[in-house]
């Protein structure tokens, strides 16, 4: 084929190709951070506009260097990965007092969102967080004001690195002491830094 014949063919192929989508970006005023793990980096947007207490709390721990050397200690494929509170030996790090539960902020636990981990007590969240690797709206969203229905606060979302979250969720795991779903090989959070 001559170059002139190839040109229309290339133009047709280019026009029918799937459009490339740009990675999502943070809304103006919402901070972004990089969670560096032993399996790769996860870049997140923090919803300062919708979950100010949770975001300020998370950033306080980030600025203190608290997360460096902690692990994802609970990973469940098809559900979520949880970390930010234990050392690789599963020793819980001391934290600041618990914060208010912002589950009523109308944000949902869709795939790739970040939530504040807590115990059964509604206002028990401190440093630990989780990333939803599936749509968990039915299980974790705010559905009412009883303890069973109150839900967990969403405070951010993954902008890039969701494949890292999926890798973490897929690692082999076991029971270790009182903890279920612990990675056999620790998945370490090397650090978290805010992107200016």
Language-model-detected regions and their locations in the chain:
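Sec-dependent signal peptide recognition
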Residues: 1-9
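Cyclophilin-like peptidyl-prolyl cis-trans isomerases
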Residues: 10-196
């Amino acid at each position: 084929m001559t170059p002139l014949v190839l040109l229309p063919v290339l133009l047709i192929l280019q026009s029918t190709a799937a459009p490339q989508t740009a990675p999502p970006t943070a809304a103006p005023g919402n901070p972004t951070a990089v969670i560096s793990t032993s399996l790769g980096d996860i870049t997140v947007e923090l919803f300062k506009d919708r979950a100010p207490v949770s975001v300020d709390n998370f950033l306080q721990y980030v600025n203190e260097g608290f997360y460096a050397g902690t692990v994802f200690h609970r990973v469940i494929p098809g559900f979520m990965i949880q970390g930010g509170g234990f050392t690789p030996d599963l020793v819980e790090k001391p934290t600041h007092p618990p914060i208010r539960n912002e589950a009523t902020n109308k944000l949902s636990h869709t795939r790739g969102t970040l939530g504040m981990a807590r115990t059964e007590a509604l206002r028990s969240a401190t440093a630990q967080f989780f990333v939803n690797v599936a749509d968990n709206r039915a299980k974790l969203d705010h559905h009412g004001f009883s303890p069973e229905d109150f839900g967990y606060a969403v405070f951010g979302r993954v902008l890039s690195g969701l494949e890292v979250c999926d890798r973490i969720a897929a690692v082999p795991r076991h029971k270790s002491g009182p903890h279920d779903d612990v990675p056999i090989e620790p998945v370490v959070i090397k650090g978290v830094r805010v992107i200016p």
